[in-house]
Amino acid sequence: GKTPVSQSGMREGTLGNDNVTWEVAKKANVGLDLYFWKNRFKFTVDLFQEKRSNILAVRNDVPDQTGLNSSKLPAQNIGKVTNKGYEFELSFTEKIGNVDVSLGGNFTFARSNIDYIAEAQLKYPWMMRVNNPVGQPFGYVWTGKFYDYDDLENPNVPKPNGKISAGDLMFEDLNGDGVIDGYDKKAIGYSTVPEIIYGFNQSFSYKGFYLDLFWQGAAHVSSRFTNELRYEFHSNNVLPFHLDRWVYDPERGLDTRATAKYPALVIGGSTWTKENSSFQYLNSAFLRLKTAEFGYNFPVSLCHKMHLGGLRVYLSGSNLLTFDKIGWIDPEYNSESTGQRGNA
């Protein structure tokens, strides 16, 4: 035979762009500040809109027949995005008897819209990213069901091309052609950037004792839990919700087909369940007691006797309470990195 010989060389990669410039932002806002009840109450509201242009983006509307694709083209100042929304803040301070009370809250709603990104005209409107929020995930829509053995043999049940197993996720056939493929991907869930952010604080003090609480929350937001939902044996481990997996093993008397909430755990099986889908993107809205502190400030006169400028003892904590729809993981955690699959 012949001994192969390799030779290092160079080739042109992505084209450069010497004309890159700054983004352009045009902002407009209207605000109102109100004070009443001798300034005990303060209310602030602000309406805003921002239009950004010249955003760096790579064209995706160049035909493949040209010999170029998005991986070879340089980024250009072509993107356009609109952000608009409102925010308001309310605060209250008062002394009730010997108790000093301070309450406050804020709420922000901001929605973005992709106006232009040089996107090719795709076959179906639900595939387009234009007119969706920034950070909007795309993928398959999970029907809430899993493929059963009968489904695999039924030609009327839409299925993807390639390997598929009983217990895999069943996705919607959006275009009705009987095949689950890239034409069935659409915007799923909310954006990964929360549209709503809010918080409120409570502060009470009485004769040196004090209690400070700060709550924080977010809504209209989705998070992708790749490692935990896509790679079930991530870090060679499983989680409690994996107990609700799809199982059909009549010899051992196991049948969870009617109650399963998670696909079958199979190493080296179908990769179809790993595809981006609404199964992986969860509603990660939450309300959390972000910080809490209870303490006592010693009297100034006592501190002076001890030659101290001040003395305080306190207990504090963070993330003490969380209210969310997920339950088994921190809703602010977003595992976008590639997971690990265990060994058989």
Task: Show where each model-derived region lies.
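Conserved small-residue
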Residues: 76, 95-192, 230-232, 244-255, ...
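Extracellular/periplasmic, surface-exposed regions of secreted and cell-surface proteins
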Residues: 1-137, 276, 281-344
